[in-house]
Amino acid sequence: MREIFFSVLLFSCLALGLGNRVYVHPFSLFALGNVSCEVIQSKEPEQVDVVKATPIGLQDNTEPDIRDLSDSNAMENSTQRKDVLAELQNTLGLRMYKVLTRNQKDSNTLFSPVNVFGTLVTLYLGASKKTAVPYQVLLGINKESSREDCVYLIDGHKVLRTLQEINALIDGPRDELRTLVWSFITQDAEISKDFIGGAQDFSDASYTRSVDFSKAEEAEKKVNNFIQKTSDGDIKQIFQNLSSTTNFLFASSVHFKGNWRTAFQPEATSVQDFRVDEQTTVSIPLMTRTGEYKYLNDKGRKCTVVKLGLSERTYMLLVLPHEGASLQDIENQLQTEVISKWYQNLQEGYLELSLPKFSLTDLTDLKSVLTDMAVEKLLLGSDAQFQRLSNKEKFTVDKVFSKVVFEMSEEGSQVSTKTEDGRVPLKLTVNRPFLFAIVEGNSNAILMLGKIRNPAV
């Protein structure tokens, strides 16, 4: 069974990335210290340096965890690590997105591959050596061993810092992409210092608190209120139906605020019909800008792809199905090599592009997604062990959520200039469901991936 699981996951993780690069085995870039196969102890507890978390509500303390800056030096092979990690997180992210969207066929969807990848790596830091193996396989950073009783471990901190380096490549204001992390542990357990450090590596600010879960309803209110306070009111009511036996809750959020590189023309905004499905039409404002774009008419996949610049390097890739074509069919074909071919085949064109104003927020239940992928039992369920997260026996990770917030305006860093040179633009009106990806252009990492079924909701 173990061999089957590994082979299935490894096949998905070995897909080509968004560029033609010399292949480097990911494990060699992210290995932990001296590469040796560490024995998996089945009986003896793993040694963990733990601390007591600050009780939630103590003097209304909402300050983030204090960062340890002693090990924040720049890493070697940074560019290569970013490129390789971008490929890995894109591959896993697209796979998870397709699982997620199967259950959200008729609703808007927003998913962050970089945020979920970081969440998994943070949880990996708390996993036992036995549980570390399926995590590494899913992430695509595993080195196989001929022995069943040992594992080659990766340096999770190195992975998380590389993810943050990818985020830092976004060349707008720092609050353009902001990541927050919350960890809530039962008050009768202590938490690993290493895990807390990983949450800090992963985020712009992290919060670790202990909670009395024996009073489940009261604990639920305290946890949700704390998240709302520390997210400036952006995030509300993440956790529901908590149990008195809860050991650990984990939540992360990523908030993207973007402006178009070239502004849309405010005077050209007009209310038009958006066809949600054959029975439903809504009236919404469509922004319009006429100018030069890079685009592709993919006749084989029956869609038009347009690149829209955001900051200097970050861009949106918008995918609009042809009239009568199925959005779901295009979603089912999403792979890193498909997106790579789209990007490579983009050509300059003169377009009159009309696009809905939209902002989007979504919440991903990671346990639910992993269950649909048939790996939750190994990673977070009954077979998962987290001796490196806490010193409490039979410690469980009960709920894991990823919150994604996406905001765009019609404003831009450059003013759109009208061109009156006699050319007739090709009209492209985004008046039906579409896909979009937010991509960091240096590493080609997909930061966000989503679909708009109805921009009015």
Residue spans of the language-model regions?
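Non-catalytic, conformational "gating/processing" segments within enzyme and secreted inhibitor domains
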Residues: 43-55, 59, 106-107, 111, ...
